[in-house]
C-alpha cells in the first residue's frame, strides 16, 4: 500500500514537472522571440573598424600607416586577402565546428557544462568565433549574463552575416599582442609580409596568439609562442586541414621573426593628405618609382642653402599627382624641411606668360610672328625691366615668349584685359589669385600674385590637354607648346 502511494507521488511529481517544464519552455520561447524583436542585432557596430589609415601609392605600396583613434594598429582586409593558411588555422584552433553551428556550439556547450559539473572547474570553453566576434565588437565583463547576451547576439548575427563575413570580421578584430589588431597588422609587424605571403608555420604562429596575446607574443615569449603554434598545427591535422607529415615538418621549424619598420615615404605628400590639404583616397595616385627618382634628383642637385626647392609631377592626361617633393630634406628642421613648397603660396614669376600668349592667339589678338616692342616703359611708380636689364627693341611674339621678355608680356596683357586674364587663370585652378584686378595691376603677368606650385602644374596640364570648348582652344595651346618646345627654343636662342 505504501509502495503504491510512493509510486503515485512520484508520478504526480513527474507530471507536474513535465507540465511546468512545458509551460516554462513556452514562456522561454515567448521571451526569446520578444527579445529578438525588441533588441535587434546592432549591425552598425560591424560596419566599421577602429582602423588605422593606410596610405599607399597607385600600386598598393604602403607609404605610411597611422594609429587608429584608440591607438591601435589595425589594417582591415577582405577575406580574399587573408591568405591560404591563416583562416583555416584560426578555425582549427578557435572553433572547429564553425561552419556547422549557427552561432552557438551546443555540443561544445554541453561538454563544457558536464566537465564543470563533474570536475568542479572549467576544463574547456564553449565560445565560438561568432560569440568572440560579438565580444570583440562590444566588449563586456566576462560574467555569466555577458556570455548569455553574447550567445544571443551570435545567434542573431548568423541570420544576418554569412560565415565568410563573420570570419573576415573576426580576422580583422582579433588581438595579436601589443597594439596590433587584425591579421594584416600582425603579419606585417612580425614577419614584414602580407598575409597572402605567410607560410604554414608563420600562419599557425599568428593563429595561436588571440587566445592570450600578451602571454604568447613571439618577440617576448618565443617558447610559449612556439608551444601554442605547435598546438595549432596539431589541431589543423585533427580538422584535416593539413597532413600529419606536414604538421611534423612545421613543428620542427624554429620561430624566425622579421620585425617590420613601418614605411615613412613621400612625407610631404602623405602629410598633405592626412592634414586634409589634398583630397585623395587612401590608395593614392602617386607612383613610388617616380617619387624616388624625383627625391634622388633633388638630393643630388640641391645645395645646403637651397631650402625652398619643391617638385610636383602630374599625369598631364588627368592631372593625377605622380610625385611630390616639398623640400630637399624633410627632416631638416633648421631649414623648415617639413614645409611643403608645392602647396605654399609663392610668386609665379614669369610662368603665367604662356597662358597670356595662348589666350591672345586664341582671340585673334596676336600671331607668333607679330612684331612687339621691347622698349622701356614708365608705369605709375614702376618701371618694369627684363631679367638681364636689357631691352631688345623690336622682337617677334615668338622670340618674346621664348626669351620671357617682360615688356611685350605687359602689352599682351593690355590687349587681353586684366579682368579677363585674371578670370581665366582662376578658371584654370589658380584660386589663390583671389584679389581684384586693381590689386594686381599689370604686374600680374610678371609674378605679382601668389599661386601654389600644384595649382600651376595642373593649369599647365590643362593647357597641354586642351580640348574643343575649353577656355583656351587646342590650336592656341599647340602654338604655344610648339614655340616653347626644344627645337623652336633652340632656333630662337642660338640661331
Task: Give names to the regions the model predicted.
Residues 56, 312-316:
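Short hydrophobic alpha-helical segments used for membrane anchoring or interfacial signaling
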Residues 1-305, 320-322, 327, 375:
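Juxtamembrane regions of bacterial inner-membrane/periplasmic proteins
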Residues 118-142, 196, 260-275, 366-421, ...:
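Conserved catalytic neighborhood of penicillin-recognizing serine enzymes
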Residues 154, 219, 225, 250, ...:
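Active-site-proximal helix/loop microenvironment
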Residues 89-91, 95, 236, 294, ...:
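Active-site SXXK
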Residues 99-109, 181-184, 244-247, 335, ...:
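Short, well-structured active-site flanking segments
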Residues 284-304, 311, 324, 332-341, ...:
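A penicillin-recognizing enzyme superfamily signal
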Residues 74-78, 329-344:
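A short, polar/charged loop-to-alpha-helix boundary motif
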